[in-house]
Amino acid sequence: SDSHHHSYIRFKWALTEDKPVIKYYYEQLWAELPDAKTAPIQMSLNHLKAVHNKLVYFLKLLTEEQLNLSFIHPEHNNEVLLKQNIGIYAWHSNHHYAHIENLLKRKGWL
Protein backbone atom coordinates (compact mmCIF):
# COMPACT_ATOMS: atom_id res chain seq x y z
CA SER A 1 0.00 0.00 0.00
CA ASP A 2 2.99 2.31 0.48
CA SER A 3 3.65 2.38 -3.27
CA HIS A 4 0.08 3.46 -3.94
CA HIS A 5 0.31 6.13 -1.26
CA HIS A 6 3.41 7.51 -3.01
CA SER A 7 1.52 7.67 -6.29
CA TYR A 8 -1.34 9.57 -4.66
CA ILE A 9 1.15 12.12 -3.29
CA ARG A 10 2.73 12.53 -6.74
CA PHE A 11 -0.62 13.69 -8.14
CA LYS A 12 -0.89 16.22 -5.31
CA TRP A 13 2.65 17.52 -5.84
CA ALA A 14 1.94 18.13 -9.52
CA LEU A 15 -1.07 20.26 -8.61
CA THR A 16 0.67 22.29 -5.94
CA GLU A 17 4.16 22.78 -7.41
CA ASP A 18 5.49 23.71 -10.84
CA LYS A 19 6.72 20.49 -12.48
CA PRO A 20 8.10 19.07 -9.25
CA VAL A 21 10.83 16.47 -9.28
CA ILE A 22 9.20 13.68 -7.32
CA LYS A 23 11.05 11.91 -4.56
CA TYR A 24 12.50 8.58 -5.62
CA TYR A 25 12.35 5.87 -2.99
CA TYR A 26 13.66 2.33 -2.76
CA GLU A 27 10.56 0.12 -2.79
CA GLN A 28 12.53 -3.00 -1.90
CA LEU A 29 13.97 -1.36 1.21
CA TRP A 30 10.53 -0.12 2.24
CA ALA A 31 9.26 -3.70 1.86
CA GLU A 32 11.90 -4.82 4.36
CA LEU A 33 10.82 -2.39 7.09
CA PRO A 34 9.27 -3.94 10.23
CA ASP A 35 5.69 -2.84 9.55
CA ALA A 36 5.79 -4.33 6.06
CA LYS A 37 7.10 -7.61 7.46
CA THR A 38 5.00 -8.03 10.61
CA ALA A 39 1.77 -6.02 10.42
CA PRO A 40 -1.46 -7.92 9.75
CA ILE A 41 -2.19 -7.99 6.01
CA GLN A 42 -5.58 -6.40 6.66
CA MET A 43 -3.86 -3.14 7.65
CA SER A 44 -2.25 -2.85 4.22
CA LEU A 45 -5.46 -3.85 2.45
CA ASN A 46 -7.40 -1.20 4.40
CA HIS A 47 -4.74 1.40 3.59
CA LEU A 48 -4.84 0.46 -0.10
CA LYS A 49 -8.63 0.75 -0.18
CA ALA A 50 -8.54 4.14 1.54
CA VAL A 51 -5.85 5.50 -0.79
CA HIS A 52 -7.74 4.31 -3.87
CA ASN A 53 -11.02 5.77 -2.64
CA LYS A 54 -9.35 9.13 -2.03
CA LEU A 55 -7.50 9.04 -5.35
CA VAL A 56 -10.59 8.20 -7.41
CA TYR A 57 -12.58 10.95 -5.71
CA PHE A 58 -9.72 13.40 -6.26
CA LEU A 59 -9.14 12.47 -9.93
CA LYS A 60 -12.82 12.87 -10.81
CA LEU A 61 -12.59 16.52 -9.75
CA LEU A 62 -9.63 17.44 -11.95
CA THR A 63 -10.10 19.78 -14.89
CA GLU A 64 -8.55 19.27 -18.33
CA GLU A 65 -6.06 22.00 -17.47
CA GLN A 66 -5.06 20.18 -14.28
CA LEU A 67 -4.73 16.87 -16.12
CA ASN A 68 -2.12 18.56 -18.32
CA LEU A 69 0.06 19.43 -15.33
CA SER A 70 3.10 17.26 -14.79
CA PHE A 71 5.91 16.09 -12.58
CA ILE A 72 9.45 15.00 -13.33
CA HIS A 73 10.37 11.42 -12.52
CA PRO A 74 14.02 11.44 -11.38
CA GLU A 75 14.85 7.92 -12.49
CA HIS A 76 14.96 8.91 -16.18
CA ASN A 77 14.36 12.66 -15.84
CA ASN A 78 11.06 12.22 -17.74
CA GLU A 79 8.20 14.68 -17.58
CA VAL A 80 4.95 12.82 -16.85
CA LEU A 81 1.57 14.47 -17.46
CA LEU A 82 -1.07 13.66 -14.88
CA LYS A 83 -3.37 12.32 -17.61
CA GLN A 84 -0.57 9.94 -18.63
CA ASN A 85 0.08 8.99 -15.04
CA ILE A 86 -3.55 7.91 -14.62
CA GLY A 87 -2.99 5.23 -17.28
CA ILE A 88 0.35 4.22 -15.78
CA TYR A 89 -1.21 4.03 -12.34
CA ALA A 90 -4.21 2.00 -13.57
CA TRP A 91 -1.85 -0.61 -15.05
CA HIS A 92 0.31 -0.54 -11.91
CA SER A 93 -2.75 -1.04 -9.69
CA ASN A 94 -4.07 -3.96 -11.73
CA HIS A 95 -0.61 -5.53 -11.62
CA HIS A 96 -0.46 -5.15 -7.83
CA TYR A 97 -4.01 -6.44 -7.38
CA ALA A 98 -3.09 -9.61 -9.27
CA HIS A 99 -0.14 -10.14 -6.91
CA ILE A 100 -2.33 -9.48 -3.87
CA GLU A 101 -5.03 -11.87 -5.07
CA ASN A 102 -2.45 -14.60 -5.71
CA LEU A 103 -0.95 -14.11 -2.24
CA LEU A 104 -4.37 -14.20 -0.58
CA LYS A 105 -5.22 -17.44 -2.39
CA ARG A 106 -1.81 -19.00 -1.71
CA LYS A 107 -2.03 -18.23 2.01
CA GLY A 108 -5.66 -19.38 2.21
CA TRP A 109 -6.82 -15.91 3.26
CA LEU A 110 -9.35 -15.67 0.43
Q: What are these model-predicted stretches?
A:
Residues 10, 30-68, 89:
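Acidic/histidine-rich alpha-helical segments that form the ligand environment
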Residues 1-28, 56, 71-110:
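Short, contiguous alpha-helical
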